[in-house]
Amino acid sequence: MKKNFSRIVSIVAFSSLLGGMAFAQPAERGRNPQVRLLSAEQSMSKVQFRMDNLQFTDVQTSKGVAQVPTFTEGVNISEKGTPILPILSRSLAVSETRAMKVEVVSSKFIEKKDVLIAPSKGVISRAENPDQIPYVYGQSYNEDKFFPGEIATLSDPFILRDVRGQVVNFAPLQYNPVTKTLRIYTEIVVAVSETAEAGQNTISLVKNSTFTGFEDIYKSVFMNYEATRYTPVEEKENGRMIVIVAKKYEGDIKDFVDWKNQRGLRTEVKVAEDIASPVTANAIQQFVKQEYEKEGNDLTYVLLVGDHKDIPAKITPGIKSDQVYGQIVGNDHYNEVFIGRFSCESKEDLKTQIDRTIHYERNITTEDKWLGQALCIASAEGGPSADNGESDIQHENVIANLLTQYGYTKIIKCYDPGVTPKNIIDAFNGGISLVNYTGHGSETAWGTSHFGTTHVKQLTNSNQLPFIFDVACVNGDFLFSMPCFAEALMRAQKDGKPTGTVAIIASTINQSWASPMRGQDEMNEILCEKHPNNIKRTFGGVTMNGMFAMVEKYKKDGEKMLDTWTVFGDPSLLVRTLVPTEMQVTAPANISASAQTFEVACDYNGAIATLSDDGDMVGTAIVKDGKAIIKLNESIADETNLTLTVVGYNKVTVIKDVKVEGTSIADVANDKPYTVAVSGKTITVESPAAGLTIFDMNGRRVATAKNRMVFEAQNGVYAVRIATEGKTYTEKVIVK
């Protein structure tokens, strides 16, 4: 193995030219602090890049010692045989329909002479050892010009749900291999503006509102995003989930769906064979698209229930993908919907995945001290060709430090050489809540430790289940001839109790060496709330946003990694990091059958409070300023019990009974002071001296009137509310 050592660029001769450029300071993880949005107008944004933490690493090549440059957030996407010249990328929200252009407003640079920049090894797979791949000088080293040429470019536009975006790329290092001159741009200011020409990958229909649940994602992805550009949809932070289930498991999914509704996520079931028979990937993709495009239905999560032979992954050359089902708007690789899978070959396989998910969200207490403990696993390989020029061990050390700063109380490090399966088994059985793995892999095992599917039966971590960010080859290839590594961990149980993991993101193909490291970095940074504008609380939200950062920086290779990095488990899983604390929740013990709202007091802002009736959601609200006011979307019957459920990040879940009292529809069934009739798609309501209101299934008011109302409805479920003679009645109406 070649020895690499860092050599910090000399700045003595350049000190008067740097203009504030920061060299050789310990780089804070995350985004380059020297990249700023200078201005954002309707049709133009200005962005300033300034060099940060430029360093050089010496490597041995066929031409002698050459240098590999790195700087904060710089990414090497150079083609094999061309000079290694990292770029930095930022995403901007742009016009929905116009083509964009980038212009350099100003720039400053210095030059370093007699420099030999090493050639790129290209995209390296984690099926290979980077140290065994030689540096090969390509034809570009004979060309008397600066590479890559332009210091600022635009990538193809992409669409993220309601917003069209475009990535601006800075190439601050320009190298002439004939004269051996390295031009270092210390500052670049660009303007990205609209043109009069029609653009590519446009948004054809601009909504007059945007789903609130993606606001933080927009703010994180786009430098210039402003929430005021749209009117947020009211009270829709949690969105909606559809469970697409193979027919043979339809009767086994009820407990999961009931719990999801109970904890505040509106969840529906669709039998896969009712979409198409036989079930095809194209049919699944089209169904998800149709559900996403339904007006007012904020589809956010899709959970596939079944193995590949039940609900197939989308297969294209070199790709086996569930994630593409969530890529709906435009022709890019940014998901609008978070996708996950309970991969199962038996009812027992499914039951343990349901049980572990419900227990994790519902039953964790202050006695679960295993939370806040993490495991970091790394190979002994990597280095200059990897993300940030890090070896796998350096990469995992950075993650370990981040977790410690956040509050994790114990970090177990299993680094090669010498890691054994027993090291991993002992770590799991001792209690851990998070695993980060970076190394080699196979369909059935981790390369570091050789812990694999044959060792899973030795796990005894009953309901002390970590989630896993896995950077490795084919650990998630659920099309393999036997259960893959990720499937084995999700199906594991001991004496009927779940063991293994509660969720894992793992690849169906050989992963690239560098780009998933950037995705894994971002996942951990989001988990540890490093980015205030990108706070995510679900496994799907954390992992997908981590991959967005990877795609932004690694372009086509990042897209391929995103498409094949598969979520095994519930994408809406509310993740836990530290030992939970208790919430103080107070609410009335009773509710009137005619009530329209229900108020809950809670000392944790951001908690989700939900009233449900035997797995049917009655209403839900977010705790703000110490209270949640739940609007009741469904009729409730007298002398029954509702369930109040309050969930919060790193909190003990609170569940209380609420008794229904007072006048209900059932009490006046034979003497109703109103009539409700449905004919085709027409709802007719009549009642003297009454206020009439119709709500759709999401609780949105769609019609109001006095005394008489005729409403033309779409297919769906509606609540008709009649207020008359001091009483309020609610009836559920189904339009087919």
From Swiss-Prot:
<feature type="binding site">
    <location>
        <position position="307"/>
    </location>
    <ligand>
        <name>Ca(2+) 1</name>
    </ligand>
</feature>
<dbReference type="InterPro" id="IPR013783">
    <property type="entry name" value="Ig-like_fold"/>
</dbReference>
<comment type="function">
    <text>Thiol protease. Acts synergistically with RgpA to catalyze the maturation of fimbrial subunits, such as FimA. Its proteolytic activity is a major factor in both periodontal tissue destruction and in evasion of host defense mechanisms.</text>
</comment>
<dbReference type="InterPro" id="IPR029030">
    <property type="entry name" value="Caspase-like_dom_sf"/>
</dbReference>
<dbReference type="GO" id="GO:0005576">
    <property type="term" value="C:extracellular region"/>
</dbReference>
<feature type="active site" description="Proton donor">
    <location>
        <position position="440"/>
    </location>
</feature>
<dbReference type="InterPro" id="IPR005536">
    <property type="entry name" value="Peptidase_C25_Ig-like_domain"/>
</dbReference>
<dbReference type="InterPro" id="IPR012600">
    <property type="entry name" value="Propeptide_C25"/>
</dbReference>
<feature type="active site" description="Nucleophile">
    <location>
        <position position="473"/>
    </location>
</feature>
<keyword id="KW-0732">Signal</keyword>
<feature type="binding site">
    <location>
        <position position="334"/>
    </location>
    <ligand>
        <name>Ca(2+) 2</name>
    </ligand>
</feature>
<feature type="binding site">
    <location>
        <position position="639"/>
    </location>
    <ligand>
        <name>Ca(2+) 5</name>
    </ligand>
</feature>
<protein>
    <recommendedName>
        <fullName>Gingipain R2</fullName>
        <ecNumber>3.4.22.37</ecNumber>
    </recommendedName>
</protein>
<feature type="signal peptide">
    <location>
        <begin position="1"/>
        <end position="24"/>
    </location>
</feature>
<feature type="propeptide">
    <location>
        <begin position="25"/>
        <end position="229"/>
    </location>
</feature>
<feature type="binding site">
    <location>
        <position position="336"/>
    </location>
    <ligand>
        <name>Ca(2+) 2</name>
    </ligand>
</feature>
<keyword id="KW-0843">Virulence</keyword>
<feature type="binding site">
    <location>
        <position position="521"/>
    </location>
    <ligand>
        <name>Ca(2+) 3</name>
    </ligand>
</feature>
<dbReference type="InterPro" id="IPR029031">
    <property type="entry name" value="Gingipain_N_sf"/>
</dbReference>
<keyword id="KW-0645">Protease</keyword>
<feature type="binding site">
    <location>
        <position position="613"/>
    </location>
    <ligand>
        <name>Ca(2+) 5</name>
    </ligand>
</feature>
<comment type="similarity">
    <text>Belongs to the peptidase C25 family.</text>
</comment>
<dbReference type="Pfam" id="PF08126">
    <property type="entry name" value="Propeptide_C25"/>
</dbReference>
<feature type="binding site">
    <location>
        <position position="478"/>
    </location>
    <ligand>
        <name>Ca(2+) 1</name>
    </ligand>
</feature>
<feature type="binding site">
    <location>
        <position position="522"/>
    </location>
    <ligand>
        <name>Ca(2+) 4</name>
    </ligand>
</feature>
<feature type="binding site">
    <location>
        <position position="487"/>
    </location>
    <ligand>
        <name>Ca(2+) 1</name>
    </ligand>
</feature>
<feature type="binding site">
    <location>
        <position position="525"/>
    </location>
    <ligand>
        <name>Ca(2+) 4</name>
    </ligand>
</feature>
<keyword id="KW-0964">Secreted</keyword>
<keyword id="KW-0106">Calcium</keyword>
<dbReference type="InterPro" id="IPR026444">
    <property type="entry name" value="Secre_tail"/>
</dbReference>
<dbReference type="InterPro" id="IPR001769">
    <property type="entry name" value="Gingipain"/>
</dbReference>
<feature type="binding site">
    <location>
        <position position="390"/>
    </location>
    <ligand>
        <name>Ca(2+) 3</name>
    </ligand>
</feature>
<keyword id="KW-0378">Hydrolase</keyword>
<dbReference type="Pfam" id="PF18630">
    <property type="entry name" value="Peptidase_M60_C"/>
</dbReference>
<dbReference type="Pfam" id="PF01364">
    <property type="entry name" value="Peptidase_C25"/>
</dbReference>
<feature type="binding site">
    <location>
        <position position="531"/>
    </location>
    <ligand>
        <name>Ca(2+) 4</name>
    </ligand>
</feature>
<feature type="binding site">
    <location>
        <position position="332"/>
    </location>
    <ligand>
        <name>Ca(2+) 2</name>
    </ligand>
</feature>
<dbReference type="Pfam" id="PF03785">
    <property type="entry name" value="Peptidase_C25_C"/>
</dbReference>
<feature type="binding site">
    <location>
        <position position="395"/>
    </location>
    <ligand>
        <name>Ca(2+) 3</name>
    </ligand>
</feature>
<dbReference type="InterPro" id="IPR041333">
    <property type="entry name" value="M60_C"/>
</dbReference>
<dbReference type="GO" id="GO:0004197">
    <property type="term" value="F:cysteine-type endopeptidase activity"/>
</dbReference>
<dbReference type="InterPro" id="IPR038490">
    <property type="entry name" value="Gingipain_propep_sf"/>
</dbReference>
